[in-house]
C-alpha cells in the first residue's frame, strides 16, 4: 500500500494558541503526532510519501525531515511551497513522486484512531472496491465541542455524498463522519478524482 500524507498546511489555530512547531510535530503521549499517524499503517510493508511545507523543512529548529525519517527511514519527503488550498491541492502538486499503479491511501497528518488496518485491507481487497472511507458515528468526546468533520451520506455502505465541516442534518451524532483516511484502488484513480474535484470547484 502507498500511504500519502499531506502535511503542508499552516496549522494557524495551533500557532495562535502558542504552539511553536507545526501540528504534526507536536508531542502527544511521548511522541510527535506524525509518529502516531505512521503507526496506523505498516512501516515494513507500506511505502510512505510525506508532502511537506518547504518552509517547515527549511526551518532548522523543526528538524522535520529528521523527525519523520527517524521513525520511517524509507519515507519519501516531498517539498512544496506553503499554501492554504488543502490536501487535494498538495497531492496534485506532488504527483511526480506518487505511484500511479499502487493502491493508495491519503491520510491526514494530525490524528490517529483505533482500528484494525489488517481488517481494513482484507475488506477492500475482498470487495474489490474502487475506494473506501473509514467512518464512525455516535457520541465521541470531540463532539462535545463544535469541531465538525467531513460527513457522509450512504446507502447500504456505499457513499452517495460527502461534505466538509457541516453535517447533513441537525443530528450529527447519527451521521457517519470520516476519520481522515481515504483509500483509492490506484494512484491513477486518486489523481483523476482529485482533478475532477478541482475542475468542478468542489474545494
Segments the model singles out, each with a brief description of its role:
Residues 1-8, 13-15, 19, 27, ...:
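Conserved N-terminal catalytic core of the sugar/cofactor nucleotidyltransferase
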Residues 21-24, 66-67, 121-125:
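Glycine-rich, phosphate-binding/catalytic loops in enzymes
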Residues 24, 74-76, 158-161:
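Conserved beta-strand segments of alpha/beta enzyme cores
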Residues 12-15, 23, 160, 182:
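Flexible, active-site-adjacent loop/turn segments at secondary-structure boundaries
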Residues 199-203:
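Short, charged, surface-exposed loops that flank catalytic or proteolytic processing sites
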Residues 109-112:
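The conserved acidic donor/metal-binding loop of glycosyltransferases
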Amino acid at each position: 500500500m502507498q500511504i500519502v500524507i499531506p502535511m503542508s498546511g499552516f496549522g494557524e489555530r495551533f500557532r495562535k494558541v502558542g504552539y511553536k512547531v507545526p501540528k504534526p510535530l507536536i508531542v502527544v503521549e511521548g511522541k510527535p503526532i506524525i509518529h502516531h499517524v505512521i503507526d496506523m499503517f505498516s512501516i515494513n510493508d507500506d511505502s510512505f510519501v510525506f508532502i511537506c511545507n518547504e518552509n517547515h523543512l527549511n526551518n532548522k529548529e523543526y528538524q522535520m525531515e529528521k523527525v519523520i525519517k527517524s521513525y520511517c527511514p524509507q519515507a519519501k519527503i516531498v517539498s512544496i511551497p506553503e499554501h492554504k488550498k488543502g490536501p487535494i491541492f498538495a497531492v496534485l502538486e506532488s504527483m511526480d513522486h506518487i505511484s500511479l499503479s499502487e493502491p493508495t491511501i491519503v491520510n491526514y497528518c494530525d490524528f490517529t484512531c483505533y482500528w484494525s488496518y489488517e481488517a481494513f485491507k482484507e475488506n477492500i481487497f475482498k470487495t474489490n472496491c474502487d475506494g473506501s472511507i473509514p467512518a464512525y458515528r455516535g457520541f465521541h468526546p470531540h463532539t462535545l465541542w463544535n469541531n465538525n468533520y467531513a460527513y457522509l451520506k450512504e446507502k447500504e455502505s456505499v457513499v452517495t455524498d460527502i461534505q466538509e465541516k457541516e453535517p447533513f442534518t441537525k443530528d450529527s451524532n447519527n451521521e457517519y463522519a470520516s476519520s481522515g483516511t481515504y483509500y483509492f484502488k490506484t494512484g491513477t484513480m486518486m489523481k483523476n478524482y482529485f482533478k475532477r474535484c478541482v475542475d468542478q470547484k468542489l474545494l
